[in-house]
Swiss-Prot record:
One of its GO terms (molecular function) is structural constituent of ribosome. Part of the 50S ribosomal subunit. Forms a cluster with proteins L14 and L19. One of the primary rRNA binding proteins, it binds directly near the 3'-end of the 23S rRNA, where it nucleates assembly of the 50S subunit. GO terms for biological process: translation. One of its GO terms (cellular component) is cytosolic large ribosomal subunit. The gene is rplC. Pfam families: Ribosomal_L3 (PF00297). Residues 126-148 are annotated as: Disordered. InterPro entries: Ribosomal_uL3 (IPR000597), Ribosomal_uL3_bac/org-type (IPR019927), Ribosomal_uL3_CS (IPR019926), Transl_B-barrel_sf (IPR009000). This is Large ribosomal subunit protein uL3. Keywords: Ribonucleoprotein, Ribosomal protein, RNA-binding, rRNA-binding.
């Protein structure tokens, strides 16, 4: 069954194992997760649990939103996400979801929005090779040929310069190194998409070996 939680990326640090091995980890703070709704096949056509994360001022929410969170006896939330393939009996509306749903050694998937890089060329954006930088070369970092003359157009999916980053990215099969229940913090091995303070969605890995 899937377990999930929402949090914010604090940054990266490192921890040492008992053998002295250094492990780079990402710190994810997962406070204020509240169950807002339990969706069932009878009422919604599918099973899922809806979780709200991080309070926001009531003046920033509309009446339907306020009525929805009132059923869970909580305040309006800034982020609302759903997790499918869950055991609905383990969740109660209005209950808080903490990091102790996970344990050390669990394999998870982390989803976030990657850092925006702005308008970038094909070398940085797609990893293409550059031309010679000297000896009379007039081709350095340009995209190169866009295709043959005959079609009179550029084919779809041609790798070209453009805006890079700012996309939803999921990194699969990351390991949880430590669970700090008191501070509601997860330490995840490796890097996680997004800048500092970015929203990160953590759930049980779908392709765990």
């Amino acid at each position: 069954m899937t377990k999930g939680i929402l949090g914010r990326k604090v940054g990266m640090t490192q921890v040492f194992t008992e053998n002295g091995e250094l492990i780079p980890v990402t710190v994810i703070e997962a406070a204020q997760n509240v169950v807002l709704q339990k969706k069932t096949v009878e009422t919604d056509g599918y099973e899922a649990v809806q979780i709200g994360f991080e309070d926001k001022r009531a003046i920033l929410s509309n009446k339907p939103e306020q009525g929805h969170v009132a059923k869970a006896n909580t305040t309006p939330k800034r982020f609302i996400r759903e997790f499918r393939d869950v055991n609905l009996d383990e969740y109660e509306i209005g209950a808080e979801v903490k990091v102790d749903v996970f344990a050390e050694g669990d394999i998870i998937d982390a989803t976030g929005v990657s850092k925006g890089k702005g308008f970038q060329g094909v070398i940085k954006r797609h990893g293409q090779s550059r031309g010679p930088m000297a000896h009379g070369s007039r081709y350095h970092r340009r995209p190169g040929s866009m295709g043959p003359v005959a079609p009179n157009r550029v084919f779809k999916n041609k790798l070209l310069p453009g805006r890079m980053g700012g996309e939803q990215i999921t990194i699969q099969n990351l390991e949880i190194v430590k669970v700090d229940v008191e501070k509601n913090v997860l330490l995840v091995k490796g890097n996680v998409p997004g800048a500092k303070k970015a929203l990160v969605q953590i759930k049980t890995a779908t392709k765990a070996k």
